[in-house]
Swiss-Prot record:
Name of the protein this chain belongs to: 1-deoxy-D-xylulose-5-phosphate synthase
Enzyme class: transferase
Cofactor note: Binds 1 Mg(2+) ion per subunit. Binds 1 thiamine pyrophosphate per subunit.
Family: Belongs to the transketolase family. DXPS subfamily.
Organism of origin: Dehalococcoides mccartyi (strain ATCC BAA-2266 / KCTC 15142 / 195)
Amino acid sequence: MHTGLEISIPHNLQMSKLLDTINSPSDLKKLTLDELRELAVQIREELVNRVTLNGGHLASSLGVVELTIALHRVFESPKDKIIWDVGHQSYAHKLLTGRREQFATLRQHGGLSGFTCRDESPHDPFGAGHASTSISAGLGMAVARDLAKEDYSVISVIGDGAISGGMSFEAINNAGHLHTKFIVILNDNGMAISPSTGALSKFLNNVRFDPRFEFAKRGAKQTITNMPFGKSVWAFTKSIKRKFEKSMLPGSLWEELGFIYLGPVDGHNIRELEAALKCAKDFESQPVLIHMITKKGKGYDDAEADAVKYHGIAPKSGGLKSGHGLSYSQVFGQTLHKIMSDNPKVVAITAAMTDGCGLSEVAADFPDRVFDVGICEQHAVTFAAGMATQGYIPVVVIYSTFLQRSFDQIIHDVCLQKLPVVFAIDRGGIVGDDGKTHQGIFDLSFMSLIPDMIVTAPSDENDLQHLLYTAVNSGKPFALRYPRGFGEGVETEGTLRNIPIGENEVLASGSEIAIFATGKSVAFAKEAMEILAESGIKPTLVNNRYISPLDTELILKIAGNHKYLITVEENVLSGGLGSRINTILAEAGLVNAVKIANIAVPDKFVEHGNQSLLRAKYGLDGKGIAQKVLSLMANTGEAKHQQILCP
């Protein structure tokens, strides 16, 4: 496969000598410009090699190699604070800040995180994983610095996608008001913003980056304002300058917001980047925005040609994740397509996740009814609420981890008004290698506690399609939570049907022990039943597809004729399925009549690691569930209520 790298990728995956000599950012200051360019090539080689093996975010990291080098030459990390928005483009930063020898462990269990992490290195002053946080965090650090009368620089690096988030503009507005010394680097990779990059802009940037220009400007202001009528002359001159810039230059918006604007800068030209950074560093009483133009996937032909595809790749593959059958996201997309074909009132809304959420074909066929609002989850929910008031049925499609950002809007703008908004919660449960910031382990809890919200988790592809159909027809706020990865391989029924709200399903009838599992955990409970059958144990298995409202009648009936009751979920224990069933049993006075165990994710932030490894570690796979069942049945001398969280 042709990569477009200037140096061929070594098959033995050993980094060549120059990169191997970089143990800290200070080592970069010894290199010549030619050596820095060579280093950039070697960094890209290592990124392609490692991410191809381990998986991760490739295109974004390839696009900021020169910026990373320039930042660490101009500034003194960790004294100076470099904050990477989202953090998925920080791989080169990790290589240059003392983590080169650990880089082989990237996104591996117990290894380096795929994002910035405060626990990992002092060079990561702020952890990330979600977008649009860097400017707020950086401004907070800069203000804290000034209050403490300390002296260091704070630099926030944010992409043109993340800057579309409302939180970014809140921070920009605040920063301009405070007039704090602070640098924001806008990494514009051409996927959202199209600024002027012509000869005039380049000429003016060459002037702006020259410290002599700033000195001359200040001197001219002092000279003119000291003359008779000088202040009026200076004001007139500035007004002419502003009018010219507004008509010709892309930075006028930022200057109106209180920032000094520098750019556009060639983000792959180390010399030009260093000049811009040094210039920005010298401004004392105003925030500076450096507008940098980069190529996402730079240096790797496949990634440059399809930056969306190579935004994130699977382990041991240079392309998209592979597997058998359809993923839950694909089944969702196909079902929604069918529903939208039949019902013109159904619309889809997503927050910069059209491809990841399986909406590409839907968007292609219904371009007027699919809305990608950018990285704006709060807006997405209230936008949906507004459409719902006018008779439309919005389906909001968001990853579980990002839905957390719109919690107030779900309560205030949807549920309080009982609006029929459907929440399609993708990547629910254990997500895997992206780690703590991306695990979808809180959604069952925070969605179930909201009054009037229906919360469901399908056990397979059939459940998913029927529950989506039910959600669209319910006329109520409705949450549909499904996992990352491929389905169970079941054959889907051709006709969609409503599943009565609150009605759960007995999949297998047994004796003594009952397992209430929800979502993906149903498949693992089935595996556990096969293991238990070898010991002559035949449990009752319930597909607990409705978490709110619960099927109280079924729970009480089964609790009344079984000795043991197990709940299984890929969600934290607090507020999840097990917690809610415990409450029902307590209110019915059955806590002492049946022995209970809740198998769930611990109430903690779950580390990165592949899904199978993490499920095994926390006892959520078939083997783990079977072991807990056997342990519960054997442990008759213990308290009747056990919360089983891990092996």
